[in-house]
Amino acid sequence: MMYHIPGVLSPQDVARFREQLEQAEWVDGRVTTGAQGAQVKNNQQVDTRSTLYAALQNEVLNAVNQHALFFAAALPRTLSTPLFNRYQNNETYGFHVDGAVRSHPQNGWMRTDLSATLFLSDPQSYDGGELVVNDTFGQHRVKLPAGDLVLYPSSSLHCVTPVTRGVRVASFMWIQSMIRDDKKRAMLFELDNNIQSLKSRYGENEEILSLLNLYHNLLREWSEI
């Protein structure tokens, strides 16, 4: 399943990020890619050795960790270190699949269950640059407002179309979920959404408490921590 997570960053935060990223050191994006991806990748990334990068990636981690909808959809166990990329002048990233595991500075290795892109450019400011994701439900083309995030299974083939006008800047990361299976995670997300909707409509009652108990028992049964 694919999820649109709105408002991860406020417009003020986005503007500040963009201003700081104008001063960043950018390097060839292929430095973080395996052999298959390097053949189809043509973009730039912020140098991960810079002081600015360390500050910005911490802000992204804090923002997603505090977003209730992100947590409900991803049920994250481990988040990768966020990266930042830039596309301009017809730069693109052809269809590829993300690696199943990635190194992690604290945990050694992590499994990539979900991929996330946090958009940092106004969609009207550039042409092209759509994230295209192929999954079991078909093909999805994504170009979200700045500050919004898209979450999708890392097992999906995906690409970024050429940016023919302007500049597309984004942050991206991977998530190891407490729930490995996409279908089970989607069921928990739907159940959680319905519980929250019923609580807002009717307040606390025995039926809602029973559903909440069911949610946590399923989470207890399926989670890997």
Curated annotation (Swiss-Prot):
<dbReference type="InterPro" id="IPR006620">
    <property type="entry name" value="Pro_4_hyd_alph"/>
</dbReference>
<keyword id="KW-0223">Dioxygenase</keyword>
<feature type="binding site">
    <location>
        <position position="96"/>
    </location>
    <ligand>
        <name>Fe cation</name>
    </ligand>
</feature>
<keyword id="KW-0847">Vitamin C</keyword>
<dbReference type="InterPro" id="IPR005123">
    <property type="entry name" value="Oxoglu/Fe-dep_dioxygenase_dom"/>
</dbReference>
<feature type="binding site">
    <location>
        <position position="98"/>
    </location>
    <ligand>
        <name>Fe cation</name>
    </ligand>
</feature>
<dbReference type="GO" id="GO:0006879">
    <property type="term" value="P:intracellular iron ion homeostasis"/>
</dbReference>
<dbReference type="Pfam" id="PF18331">
    <property type="entry name" value="PKHD_C"/>
</dbReference>
<dbReference type="GO" id="GO:0016706">
    <property type="term" value="F:2-oxoglutarate-dependent dioxygenase activity"/>
</dbReference>
<keyword id="KW-0408">Iron</keyword>
<keyword id="KW-0479">Metal-binding</keyword>
<dbReference type="GO" id="GO:0006974">
    <property type="term" value="P:DNA damage response"/>
</dbReference>
<dbReference type="InterPro" id="IPR023550">
    <property type="entry name" value="PKHD_hydroxylase"/>
</dbReference>
<dbReference type="InterPro" id="IPR041097">
    <property type="entry name" value="PKHD_C"/>
</dbReference>
<dbReference type="GO" id="GO:0005506">
    <property type="term" value="F:iron ion binding"/>
</dbReference>
<feature type="binding site">
    <location>
        <position position="158"/>
    </location>
    <ligand>
        <name>Fe cation</name>
    </ligand>
</feature>
<feature type="binding site">
    <location>
        <position position="168"/>
    </location>
    <ligand>
        <name>2-oxoglutarate</name>
    </ligand>
</feature>
<feature type="domain" description="Fe2OG dioxygenase">
    <location>
        <begin position="78"/>
        <end position="177"/>
    </location>
</feature>
<keyword id="KW-0560">Oxidoreductase</keyword>
<dbReference type="GO" id="GO:0031418">
    <property type="term" value="F:L-ascorbic acid binding"/>
</dbReference>
<dbReference type="InterPro" id="IPR044862">
    <property type="entry name" value="Pro_4_hyd_alph_FE2OG_OXY"/>
</dbReference>
<protein>
    <recommendedName>
        <fullName>PKHD-type hydroxylase YbiX</fullName>
        <ecNumber>1.14.11.-</ecNumber>
    </recommendedName>
</protein>
<dbReference type="Pfam" id="PF13640">
    <property type="entry name" value="2OG-FeII_Oxy_3"/>
</dbReference>
